[in-house]
């Protein structure tokens, strides 16, 4: 047990934990927040805000591809 804890607290283990956390944030957390933001603001955004949206989609594109098979962002049907 001490060996495992010592390995995780060493510089290499700490660096691996930081890389894992950052990669999970880049591939899952930020794209999920971006999907939510785009869904809420897409039809009411100003032109500058839309430019920022396009940049964020470009920046987090790999994560958006990872999440795309499980999300459905089609517009809702209009009430008839």
UniProtKB/Swiss-Prot annotation:
Annotated localization: Cellular thylakoid membrane
GO MF, any single term: quinone binding
Membrane topology listed for this record: Multi-pass membrane protein
Catalytic activity: a plastoquinone + NADH + (n+1) H(+)(in) = a plastoquinol + NAD(+) + n H(+)(out); a plastoquinone + NADPH + (n+1) H(+)(in) = a plastoquinol + NADP(+) + n H(+)(out)
Thylakoid keyword on record: yes
Spans through the membrane: 14-34, 51-71
Family: Belongs to the complex I NdhL subunit family.
Subunit: NDH-1 can be composed of about 15 different subunits; different subcomplexes with different compositions have been identified which probably have different functions.
Name listed for the protein in its UniProt record: NAD(P)H-quinone oxidoreductase subunit L
Gene encoding the protein: ndhL
């Amino acid at each position: 047990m001490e060996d495992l804890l010592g390995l995780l607290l060493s510089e290499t283990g700490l660096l691996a934990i930081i890389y894992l956390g950052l990669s999970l944030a880049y591939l899952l957390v930020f794209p999920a927040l971006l999907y939510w933001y785009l869904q809420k603001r897409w039809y009411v955004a100003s032109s500058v805000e839309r430019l920022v949206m396009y940049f964020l989609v470009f920046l987090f594109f790999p994560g958006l591809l990872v999440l795309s098979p499980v999300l459905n962002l089609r517009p809702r049907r209009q009430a008839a």
